[in-house]
Protein backbone atom coordinates (compact mmCIF):
# COMPACT_ATOMS: atom_id res chain seq x y z
CA UNK A 1 0.00 0.00 0.00
CA UNK A 2 2.80 2.42 0.86
CA UNK A 3 4.41 1.95 -2.56
CA UNK A 4 1.10 2.65 -4.33
CA UNK A 5 0.51 5.73 -2.17
CA UNK A 6 3.94 7.17 -3.02
CA UNK A 7 3.52 6.58 -6.75
CA UNK A 8 0.01 8.05 -6.66
CA UNK A 9 1.24 11.16 -4.82
CA UNK A 10 4.02 11.67 -7.38
CA UNK A 11 1.60 11.17 -10.26
CA UNK A 12 -0.94 13.65 -8.89
CA UNK A 13 1.78 16.21 -8.14
CA UNK A 14 2.88 16.00 -11.77
CA UNK A 15 -0.74 16.38 -12.90
CA UNK A 16 -1.21 19.51 -10.84
CA UNK A 17 2.03 20.98 -12.20
CA UNK A 18 0.72 20.41 -15.73
CA UNK A 19 -2.58 22.08 -14.84
CA UNK A 20 -0.78 25.07 -13.33
CA UNK A 21 1.52 25.37 -16.34
CA UNK A 22 -1.48 25.53 -18.69
CA UNK A 23 0.76 24.81 -21.68
CA UNK A 24 -0.21 25.08 -25.35
CA UNK A 25 2.31 22.37 -26.33
CA UNK A 26 0.65 19.17 -27.52
CA UNK A 27 3.44 17.07 -26.00
CA UNK A 28 2.54 18.40 -22.54
CA UNK A 29 -1.01 17.19 -23.08
CA UNK A 30 0.27 13.78 -24.14
CA UNK A 31 2.14 13.68 -20.84
CA UNK A 32 -1.07 14.73 -19.08
CA UNK A 33 -2.97 11.75 -20.46
CA UNK A 34 -0.09 9.43 -19.60
CA UNK A 35 -0.41 10.60 -15.99
CA UNK A 36 -4.18 10.05 -16.06
CA UNK A 37 -3.52 6.56 -17.39
CA UNK A 38 -1.01 5.80 -14.62
CA UNK A 39 -3.32 7.20 -11.96
CA UNK A 40 -6.13 4.93 -13.18
CA UNK A 41 -3.84 1.89 -13.13
CA UNK A 42 -2.75 2.62 -9.54
CA UNK A 43 -6.32 3.15 -8.32
CA UNK A 44 -7.47 0.01 -10.13
CA UNK A 45 -4.71 -2.02 -8.45
CA UNK A 46 -5.52 -0.51 -5.06
CA UNK A 47 -9.16 -1.55 -5.41
CA UNK A 48 -8.12 -5.08 -6.37
CA UNK A 49 -6.06 -5.16 -3.16
CA UNK A 50 -9.19 -4.33 -1.17
CA UNK A 51 -8.28 -0.73 -0.33
CA UNK A 52 -11.09 1.78 0.04
CA UNK A 53 -8.88 4.83 0.70
CA UNK A 54 -5.35 5.93 -0.08
CA UNK A 55 -4.69 8.70 2.37
CA UNK A 56 -7.61 11.11 1.97
CA UNK A 57 -8.53 9.89 -1.51
CA UNK A 58 -11.39 7.48 -2.01
CA UNK A 59 -10.53 4.55 -4.28
CA UNK A 60 -13.23 4.38 -7.00
CA UNK A 61 -14.94 1.17 -8.17
CA UNK A 62 -13.04 -1.00 -10.63
CA UNK A 63 -15.33 -0.06 -13.52
CA UNK A 64 -14.67 3.65 -12.97
CA UNK A 65 -10.88 3.39 -12.98
CA UNK A 66 -10.99 0.93 -15.89
CA UNK A 67 -13.16 3.24 -18.01
CA UNK A 68 -11.03 6.26 -17.19
CA UNK A 69 -7.90 4.32 -18.07
CA UNK A 70 -9.34 3.27 -21.44
CA UNK A 71 -10.28 6.89 -22.16
CA UNK A 72 -6.75 8.02 -21.30
CA UNK A 73 -5.25 5.41 -23.66
CA UNK A 74 -7.59 6.56 -26.43
CA UNK A 75 -6.64 10.22 -25.99
CA UNK A 76 -2.91 9.49 -25.68
CA UNK A 77 -2.83 7.44 -28.89
CA UNK A 78 -4.72 10.02 -30.94
CA UNK A 79 -2.65 12.93 -29.64
CA UNK A 80 0.59 11.07 -30.35
CA UNK A 81 -0.65 10.44 -33.89
CA UNK A 82 -1.67 14.09 -34.34
CA UNK A 83 1.66 15.32 -32.95
CA UNK A 84 3.51 13.60 -35.81
CA UNK A 85 1.69 15.71 -38.42
CA UNK A 86 2.00 19.36 -39.41
CA UNK A 87 -0.83 20.16 -36.99
CA UNK A 88 1.25 19.11 -34.00
CA UNK A 89 3.06 22.46 -33.99
CA UNK A 90 -0.20 24.40 -33.64
CA UNK A 91 -1.14 25.70 -30.17
CA UNK A 92 -3.24 23.19 -28.22
CA UNK A 93 -4.85 23.91 -24.86
CA UNK A 94 -6.01 21.53 -22.15
CA UNK A 95 -9.57 22.25 -23.21
CA UNK A 96 -8.78 21.41 -26.84
CA UNK A 97 -7.42 18.01 -25.81
CA UNK A 98 -9.95 17.15 -23.09
CA UNK A 99 -12.11 14.04 -23.31
CA UNK A 100 -15.24 16.18 -23.03
CA UNK A 101 -14.21 18.15 -26.12
CA UNK A 102 -13.31 14.89 -27.89
CA UNK A 103 -16.92 13.71 -27.43
CA UNK A 104 -18.50 17.04 -28.35
CA UNK A 105 -20.24 16.81 -31.76
CA UNK A 106 -18.79 15.94 -34.17
CA UNK A 107 -17.60 13.15 -31.89
CA UNK A 108 -14.13 11.61 -31.71
CA UNK A 109 -12.24 14.32 -33.53
CA UNK A 110 -10.38 17.41 -32.37
CA UNK A 111 -11.92 20.82 -32.89
CA UNK A 112 -11.11 24.48 -32.25
CA UNK A 113 -12.66 27.94 -32.32
CA UNK A 114 -16.34 27.31 -31.92
CA UNK A 115 -18.98 29.89 -32.83
CA UNK A 116 -22.57 29.83 -31.66
CA UNK A 117 -25.55 29.24 -33.94
CA UNK A 118 -29.01 29.89 -32.54
CA UNK A 119 -31.99 27.91 -33.83
CA UNK A 120 -35.53 29.07 -33.05
CA UNK A 121 -38.17 26.35 -33.22
CA UNK A 122 -41.88 26.94 -33.99
CA UNK A 123 -41.22 30.67 -34.32
CA UNK A 124 -41.19 30.95 -30.52
CA UNK A 125 -38.69 33.34 -28.96
CA UNK A 126 -38.64 31.22 -25.80
CA UNK A 127 -37.79 28.02 -27.69
CA UNK A 128 -34.24 28.78 -28.84
CA UNK A 129 -31.40 26.26 -28.78
CA UNK A 130 -27.69 26.85 -29.28
CA UNK A 131 -25.30 24.77 -31.38
CA UNK A 132 -21.63 25.12 -32.27
CA UNK A 133 -20.01 25.63 -35.66
CA UNK A 134 -16.28 24.87 -35.59
CA UNK A 135 -13.70 26.88 -37.51
CA UNK A 136 -11.23 23.97 -37.42
CA UNK A 137 -12.03 20.25 -37.26
CA UNK A 138 -9.22 17.67 -37.28
CA UNK A 139 -10.29 14.29 -38.66
CA UNK A 140 -8.22 11.11 -38.62
CA UNK A 141 -8.08 9.24 -41.91
CA UNK A 142 -6.16 5.99 -41.41
CA UNK A 143 -2.68 7.13 -40.30
CA UNK A 144 -3.05 10.74 -41.43
CA UNK A 145 -5.11 13.73 -40.34
CA UNK A 146 -7.09 16.26 -42.35
CA UNK A 147 -8.20 19.73 -41.31
CA UNK A 148 -11.61 20.99 -42.43
CA UNK A 149 -14.11 23.64 -41.41
CA UNK A 150 -17.81 23.32 -40.67
CA UNK A 151 -20.72 25.22 -42.20
CA UNK A 152 -24.43 25.66 -41.63
CA UNK A 153 -27.39 25.47 -43.99
CA UNK A 154 -31.13 24.92 -43.66
CA UNK A 155 -30.67 21.21 -43.03
CA UNK A 156 -28.08 21.38 -40.28
CA UNK A 157 -24.42 21.86 -39.40
CA UNK A 158 -21.88 19.86 -41.38
CA UNK A 159 -18.30 19.53 -42.51
CA UNK A 160 -17.02 18.48 -45.92
CA UNK A 161 -14.25 15.89 -46.24
CA UNK A 162 -13.22 15.54 -49.85
CA UNK A 163 -16.48 15.30 -51.78
CA UNK A 164 -18.49 13.95 -48.87
CA UNK A 165 -20.69 16.13 -46.67
CA UNK A 166 -21.29 14.90 -43.10
CA UNK A 167 -23.96 16.48 -40.91
CA UNK A 168 -23.29 16.33 -37.18
CA UNK A 169 -26.39 18.39 -36.29
CA UNK A 170 -29.65 17.68 -38.13
CA UNK A 171 -32.18 20.47 -37.57
CA UNK A 172 -35.10 18.28 -38.66
CA UNK A 173 -34.33 15.75 -35.93
CA UNK A 174 -33.79 18.56 -33.44
CA UNK A 175 -37.16 20.07 -34.40
CA UNK A 176 -38.84 16.76 -33.61
CA UNK A 177 -37.36 16.90 -30.11
CA UNK A 178 -37.85 20.59 -29.31
CA UNK A 179 -40.71 21.70 -31.57
CA UNK A 180 -44.13 20.65 -32.79
CA UNK A 181 -44.59 22.35 -36.19
CA UNK A 182 -41.38 21.14 -37.86
CA UNK A 183 -40.46 24.78 -38.50
CA UNK A 184 -37.18 26.41 -37.49
CA UNK A 185 -35.13 29.51 -38.13
CA UNK A 186 -31.34 29.52 -38.00
CA UNK A 187 -29.78 32.77 -36.75
CA UNK A 188 -26.09 33.00 -37.58
CA UNK A 189 -24.45 36.38 -37.37
CA UNK A 190 -26.74 38.78 -39.22
CA UNK A 191 -28.17 36.04 -41.43
CA UNK A 192 -31.45 34.17 -40.97
CA UNK A 193 -31.97 30.79 -42.67
CA UNK A 194 -35.46 29.31 -42.63
CA UNK A 195 -36.41 25.65 -42.73
CA UNK A 196 -37.15 24.22 -46.21
CA UNK A 197 -40.85 23.81 -45.38
CA UNK A 198 -41.29 27.54 -44.72
CA UNK A 199 -39.79 28.93 -47.92
CA UNK A 200 -40.07 28.05 -51.58
CA UNK A 201 -36.84 29.62 -52.70
CA UNK A 202 -33.42 28.02 -52.53
CA UNK A 203 -31.94 28.29 -49.08
CA UNK A 204 -28.71 30.20 -48.82
CA UNK A 205 -25.71 28.43 -47.36
CA UNK A 206 -23.41 30.17 -44.90
CA UNK A 207 -19.83 29.20 -44.06
CA UNK A 208 -17.99 30.39 -40.99
CA UNK A 209 -14.77 30.87 -42.87
CA UNK A 210 -13.49 30.64 -46.40
CA UNK A 211 -14.75 27.86 -48.67
CA UNK A 212 -14.02 24.48 -47.17
CA UNK A 213 -10.60 23.20 -48.05
CA UNK A 214 -9.34 19.67 -47.84
CA UNK A 215 -5.85 19.93 -46.34
CA UNK A 216 -4.21 16.57 -45.71
CA UNK A 217 -1.27 16.29 -43.35
CA UNK A 218 2.04 15.73 -45.11
CA UNK A 219 2.76 12.37 -43.55
CA UNK A 220 0.72 10.12 -45.85
CA UNK A 221 -1.92 10.72 -48.46
CA UNK A 222 -5.41 10.33 -46.97
CA UNK A 223 -8.01 8.03 -48.44
CA UNK A 224 -11.19 9.94 -49.09
CA UNK A 225 -13.31 6.82 -48.97
CA UNK A 226 -12.71 6.57 -45.23
CA UNK A 227 -15.00 9.56 -44.65
CA UNK A 228 -18.59 8.62 -43.96
CA UNK A 229 -21.78 10.48 -44.65
CA UNK A 230 -23.78 9.34 -41.67
CA UNK A 231 -25.78 12.08 -39.96
CA UNK A 232 -24.78 12.73 -36.39
CA UNK A 233 -27.12 14.12 -33.76
CA UNK A 234 -25.75 16.32 -31.04
CA UNK A 235 -26.55 16.11 -27.38
CA UNK A 236 -29.30 18.53 -26.34
CA UNK A 237 -27.67 21.94 -26.02
CA UNK A 238 -28.48 24.52 -23.44
CA UNK A 239 -31.81 26.28 -23.86
CA UNK A 240 -31.63 30.05 -23.58
CA UNK A 241 -34.20 32.22 -21.92
CA UNK A 242 -35.39 34.84 -24.36
CA UNK A 243 -37.09 38.19 -24.00
CA UNK A 244 -40.46 39.22 -25.41
CA UNK A 245 -41.17 38.34 -29.01
CA UNK A 246 -40.30 40.97 -31.59
CA UNK A 247 -41.83 40.54 -35.02
CA UNK A 248 -40.24 41.44 -38.34
CA UNK A 249 -36.80 41.99 -36.85
CA UNK A 250 -33.48 40.67 -38.07
CA UNK A 251 -32.14 37.89 -35.89
CA UNK A 252 -28.56 38.60 -34.88
CA UNK A 253 -26.66 35.97 -32.91
CA UNK A 254 -23.79 37.02 -30.73
CA UNK A 255 -20.75 35.12 -31.93
CA UNK A 256 -18.43 34.04 -29.19
CA UNK A 257 -15.62 31.55 -29.15
CA UNK A 258 -15.88 28.50 -26.93
CA UNK A 259 -12.18 27.83 -27.39
CA UNK A 260 -10.80 30.82 -25.54
CA UNK A 261 -8.65 30.53 -22.45
CA UNK A 262 -10.70 30.69 -19.28
CA UNK A 263 -9.28 33.16 -16.78
CA UNK A 264 -9.82 33.10 -13.05
CA UNK A 265 -12.98 34.94 -12.07
CA UNK A 266 -13.59 36.49 -8.68
CA UNK A 267 -16.85 38.35 -8.24
CA UNK A 268 -16.68 41.29 -5.88
CA UNK A 269 -20.38 42.10 -5.83
CA UNK A 270 -20.64 40.93 -2.27
CA UNK A 271 -18.18 43.65 -1.26
CA UNK A 272 -20.50 46.31 -2.66
CA UNK A 273 -23.92 44.91 -1.83
CA UNK A 274 -23.99 41.68 0.09
CA UNK A 275 -21.86 42.86 2.98
CA UNK A 276 -24.57 45.38 3.71
CA UNK A 277 -27.13 42.61 3.99
CA UNK A 278 -27.56 41.53 7.59
CA UNK A 279 -28.46 37.99 6.57
CA UNK A 280 -24.78 37.31 5.83
CA UNK A 281 -23.98 37.63 9.51
CA UNK A 282 -25.30 34.07 9.86
CA UNK A 283 -24.02 32.80 6.50
CA UNK A 284 -20.86 30.84 5.83
CA UNK A 285 -18.28 32.38 3.44
CA UNK A 286 -17.41 30.02 0.59
CA UNK A 287 -15.28 29.78 -2.53
CA UNK A 288 -16.69 27.72 -5.38
CA UNK A 289 -14.09 26.09 -7.64
CA UNK A 290 -15.13 25.03 -11.15
CA UNK A 291 -13.17 23.02 -13.71
CA UNK A 292 -12.10 19.58 -14.84
CA UNK A 293 -12.99 16.91 -12.28
CA UNK A 294 -9.52 15.40 -12.08
CA UNK A 295 -7.87 18.81 -11.87
CA UNK A 296 -10.14 19.76 -8.96
CA UNK A 297 -9.38 16.50 -7.14
CA UNK A 298 -5.64 17.07 -7.45
CA UNK A 299 -5.98 20.68 -6.32
CA UNK A 300 -8.15 19.69 -3.35
CA UNK A 301 -5.53 17.09 -2.39
CA UNK A 302 -2.84 19.78 -2.40
CA UNK A 303 -5.05 22.12 -0.34
CA UNK A 304 -5.61 19.45 2.31
CA UNK A 305 -1.90 18.71 2.34
CA UNK A 306 -0.45 22.24 2.49
CA UNK A 307 -3.17 24.80 3.17
CA UNK A 308 -5.59 23.11 5.57
CA UNK A 309 -5.23 26.03 8.01
CA UNK A 310 -6.62 28.48 5.44
CA UNK A 311 -10.12 26.95 5.13
CA UNK A 312 -12.61 24.93 7.14
CA UNK A 313 -14.18 22.27 4.91
CA UNK A 314 -13.80 21.01 1.33
CA UNK A 315 -16.63 19.21 -0.46
CA UNK A 316 -16.35 16.27 -2.81
CA UNK A 317 -16.55 17.05 -6.53
CA UNK A 318 -20.13 17.54 -7.69
CA UNK A 319 -22.10 18.64 -10.76
CA UNK A 320 -25.37 20.35 -11.48
CA UNK A 321 -27.79 17.59 -12.53
CA UNK A 322 -30.37 19.75 -14.29
CA UNK A 323 -30.29 19.84 -18.12
CA UNK A 324 -30.66 23.61 -17.78
CA UNK A 325 -27.40 23.86 -15.80
CA UNK A 326 -25.22 26.82 -16.84
CA UNK A 327 -22.18 24.56 -17.34
CA UNK A 328 -21.05 20.94 -17.16
CA UNK A 329 -17.92 21.58 -15.10
CA UNK A 330 -17.20 19.76 -11.87
CA UNK A 331 -17.47 21.86 -8.70
CA UNK A 332 -15.71 21.82 -5.33
CA UNK A 333 -16.97 24.07 -2.53
CA UNK A 334 -14.66 25.39 0.20
CA UNK A 335 -16.02 26.90 3.43
CA UNK A 336 -14.36 29.40 5.76
CA UNK A 337 -14.79 30.49 9.35
CA UNK A 338 -14.77 34.17 8.33
CA UNK A 339 -14.38 36.48 5.36
CA UNK A 340 -10.91 37.34 6.65
CA UNK A 341 -9.84 33.69 6.46
CA UNK A 342 -11.24 33.47 2.95
CA UNK A 343 -9.33 36.57 1.86
CA UNK A 344 -6.15 35.17 3.39
CA UNK A 345 -6.74 31.97 1.39
CA UNK A 346 -7.15 33.91 -1.87
CA UNK A 347 -4.03 35.96 -1.13
CA UNK A 348 -1.89 32.94 -0.25
CA UNK A 349 -2.96 30.09 -2.54
CA UNK A 350 -2.14 30.04 -6.24
CA UNK A 351 -5.18 28.70 -8.08
CA UNK A 352 -4.37 27.05 -11.45
CA UNK A 353 -5.54 29.05 -14.48
CA UNK A 354 -7.63 26.06 -15.60
CA UNK A 355 -9.81 26.41 -12.48
CA UNK A 356 -12.39 29.18 -12.18
CA UNK A 357 -13.29 30.39 -8.72
CA UNK A 358 -16.10 32.52 -7.36
CA UNK A 359 -16.77 33.78 -3.85
CA UNK A 360 -20.11 33.81 -2.10
CA UNK A 361 -22.03 32.75 0.98
CA UNK A 362 -23.82 29.57 2.01
CA UNK A 363 -27.00 30.17 3.97
CA UNK A 364 -27.20 26.58 5.24
CA UNK A 365 -26.13 26.02 8.84
CA UNK A 366 -23.28 23.55 8.95
CA UNK A 367 -23.10 20.98 11.74
From Swiss-Prot:
It comes from the Viruses. It comes from Human papillomavirus 11. GO terms for biological process: DNA replication; DNA-templated transcription; regulation of DNA replication; viral DNA genome replication. Binds DNA as homodimer. Interacts with protein E1; this interaction greatly increases E1 DNA-binding activity. Interacts with protein L1; this interaction enhances E2-dependent replication and transcription activation. Interacts with protein L2; this interaction inhibits E2 transcriptional activity but not DNA replication function E2. Interacts with protein E7; this interaction inhibits E7 oncogenic activity. Interacts with host TAF1; this interaction modulates E2-dependent transcriptional regulation. Interacts with host BRD4; this interaction mediates E2 transcriptional activation function. This is Regulatory protein E2. Residues 225-246 are annotated as: Disordered. Residues 283-367 are annotated as: DNA-binding domain. Plays a role in the initiation of viral DNA replication. A dimer of E2 interacts with a dimer of E1 in order to improve specificity of E1 DNA binding activity. Once the complex recognizes and binds DNA at specific sites, the E2 dimer is removed from DNA. E2 also regulates viral transcription through binding to the E2RE response element (5'-ACCNNNNNNGGT-3') present in multiple copies in the regulatory regions of the viral genome. Activates or represses transcription depending on E2RE's position with regards to proximal promoter elements including the TATA-box. It is found in: Host nucleus. Its main location: host cell.
Amino acid sequence: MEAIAKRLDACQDQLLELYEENSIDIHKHIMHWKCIRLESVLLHKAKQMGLSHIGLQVVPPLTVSETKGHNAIEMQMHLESLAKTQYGVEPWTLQDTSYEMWLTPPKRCFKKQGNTVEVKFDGCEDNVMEYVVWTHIYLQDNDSWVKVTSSVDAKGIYYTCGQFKTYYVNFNKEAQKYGSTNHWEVCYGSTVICSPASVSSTVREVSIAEPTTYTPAQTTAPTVSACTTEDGVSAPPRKRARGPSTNNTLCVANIRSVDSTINNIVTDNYNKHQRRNNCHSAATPIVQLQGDSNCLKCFRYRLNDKYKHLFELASSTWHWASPEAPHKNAIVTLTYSSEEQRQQFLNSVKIPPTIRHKVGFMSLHLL
